[in-house]
Amino acid sequence: MAVADLYTLTNSRDPLTSSNDFYRLRQYGLYGSIQLDYRRWSFLNITGRNDWSSTLPVDNNSYFYPSVTASVLLSEAFGWRSKAVNYLKIRGGWSQVGADANPYQLATVFTSETAFNGNPLQSSSTIGMNPNLKPEKTSSIEAGFEAAFWDNRLCLDFTYYKTDSRNQILKLATTAASGYTSQVRNAGHIRNRGYEIQLGAVPIQTSKGFRWNLDLNYGANSSKVVKLDDEGLITSYQLYSSGIQILASVGEAYGTLFGTSYVRDANGNVVVDANGLPKISTTNKTLGKFTPDWTGGISNTFSYRSLSLSFLIDASVGGSIFSNTNKTGKYTGVLANTLSGRDAEHGGLWYYTAAMGNNVRLPESPSYSVSSDGLYYAQVNGQSTRVYQDGIMVEGVTESGSKNEEVVSAEKYYHRIYSIAEANVYDASYVKLREVALSYRLPRLWTQKLHLQEASVTLTGRNLWTIYKLSLIHISEPTRRTPIS
């Protein structure tokens, strides 16, 4: 509150903003399905749906999307059931999913603005609408198998999938000479393919009521932006920009990180300028992708009679994360990792500034005195000279290829890497203890008195421990998502 104990909305320290919007759309749909089975071991499911949407033009407002799935129980069809083999199943499917546009994407209209001198004003949108929009379409294929062995003590589930999303409705940048800065278009073809594996096991089960359930899962997904427009003129689409760009770039994985980088020589060494500071690339470069290479998890549940203890560990390997927090924290010097080089105690080098303005490193810690205003002075070449202990020598090479020997102040160094996006991109891999739960199932005598069939009390803890991570920053789920598929 701006003023204590004054309970009104206008008394908020952060003033509230509000707006009025009204959207209307009409959508109709028809759906049908057919389910067939043969001798209870072969199954076929067919579905079809047709939607009509008012947000699409009359010629394209109807879109149909079907699906077909089939499965065969091999253990039943060929009589393979035994004590060792309980269940074998193969399955496959193909489907399409359609989607319409947001309301009012077909025609450019005027919007009301603040009145001028009592006269109402209206303005035209800078977004060019499209009267020829088509519905989005996503096609998917999937295949897999399931198996269970030894009285279901070991279960396996494998799935392979591929999805293609086409005709995505995007706002693409256009030349301002057209009167608009962007235009709504059907664009974008993104392909995802991958596989998922789930393994369940009961390693221990005793007659006295002890049971150990183990579940493992693993998944890997590969995405690729196939194209953004039919003409091939658009090569990238910006999803987000703040210190770094997140792009959908043709030929690359969805969610590419794009930004400034260190200038490096042919051997990968950082190149410094004449002052000893890292050089910044003049063009943006690919710095990684925010999607992981694979994810996985391990779940264990130990139960004994009415008690059970479970814990879940999950992992994400690969992918990159950009930290605006670290970027700003380095510039302002509020992060603990910016202590490095800021004084001699934290590895800072002693130096003085020569008459020509260049910094000269002192060979060792000088015998210095401190003035009343906290400045350091030492004898250099027989003269009392102001000296500094916040020197950093960047590990790299000069433009001529020789080893860098220039000293820069820690402040200038951290200010320089503020402008280098690569310096603030981190490996997003982690392994976490995601959840621990302890449960107690109440005795049946108690639940019967409460007219309950069953009840339990559970103590749960989540996100308790980051077991492994490469970067110094806290890694969790992304805080900004702007998907186009």
Name every feature range the model reports, one short phrase each:
Residues 116-122:
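P-loop NTPase nucleotide-binding/switch module
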